[in-house]
């Protein structure tokens, strides 16, 4: 993976994305938007701590192997969905927090093969759809509003990742 990037810049960007996720959850907890029952609180705290650890790993750690980077993407996907669905926010904010998937998808689109990228996209589609259904069923949001919120997020994390994948593949073919 190292031959394809300015490793320090990529590490800092991915670290900043992970740390931003952690800071958002920290602020949720500090300002009373955290989960209000025991199990969701544990989930939220676990996701926050995991995001801080992942951010520190990307900032201070060595360049990850492909397996480590893929594990990061999968764990980050689950952490984003778990922290999102357990927070006590307005429904629009709840679904909007899925936008954290965009930088994760860009990492996947640039560095991963099509199967790892497909796994990331499938997890994102599933998780974002679950969040959208949740805000309709549990929070009483109109279905149309949920779709209007859901669609740009899905298009963004899918589109950016696929565009980067296509660009990367064409660049690799040029140099073969």
Predicted regions and their residues:
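Short, Lys/Arg-rich, polar N-terminal cytosolic tail immediately upstream
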Residues: 1-7
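Hydrophobic transmembrane alpha-helices and their membrane-interface boundaries in multi-pass
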Residues: 12-92, 97-105
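Juxtamembrane or sensor-core-proximal signal-transducing alpha helices
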Residues: 59, 148-176
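Membrane-helix interface segments
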Residues: 65-68, 113-119
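Central hydrophobic cores of alpha-helical transmembrane segments
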Residues: 71-77, 118-130
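Interfacial aromatic-anchored transmembrane helix boundaries in multi-pass membrane proteins
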Residues: 88-90, 128-147
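Hydrophobic alpha-helical membrane segments of integral membrane proteins
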Residues: 96-100, 115-123
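Transmembrane alpha-helices and immediately adjacent membrane-cytoplasm interface residues
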Residues: 108-116, 161
């Amino acid at each position: 993976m190292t031959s394809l990037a300015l490793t320090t810049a990529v590490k800092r960007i991915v670290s900043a994305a992970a740390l931003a996720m952690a800071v958002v959850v920290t602020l949720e907890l500090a300002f009373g938007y955290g989960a209000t029952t025991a199990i969701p609180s544990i989930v939220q705290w676990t996701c926050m701590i995991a995001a801080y650890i992942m951010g520190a790993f990307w900032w201070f750690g060595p360049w990850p192997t492909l397996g480590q980077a893929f594990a990061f993407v999968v764990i980050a996907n689950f952490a984003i969905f778990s922290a999102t669905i357990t927070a006590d926010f307005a429904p629009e904010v709840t679904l909007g927090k899925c936008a954290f998937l965009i930088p994760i998808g860009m990492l996947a689109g640039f560095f991963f093969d099509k199967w790892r990228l497909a796994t990331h996209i499938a997890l994102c589609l599933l998780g974002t759809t679950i969040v959208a259904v949740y805000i309709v069923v549990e929070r009483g949001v109109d279905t149309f509003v949920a779709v209007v919120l859901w669609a740009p997020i899905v298009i963004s994390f899918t589109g950016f990742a696929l565009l980067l994948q296509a660009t990367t593949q064409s660049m690799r073919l040029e140099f073969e």
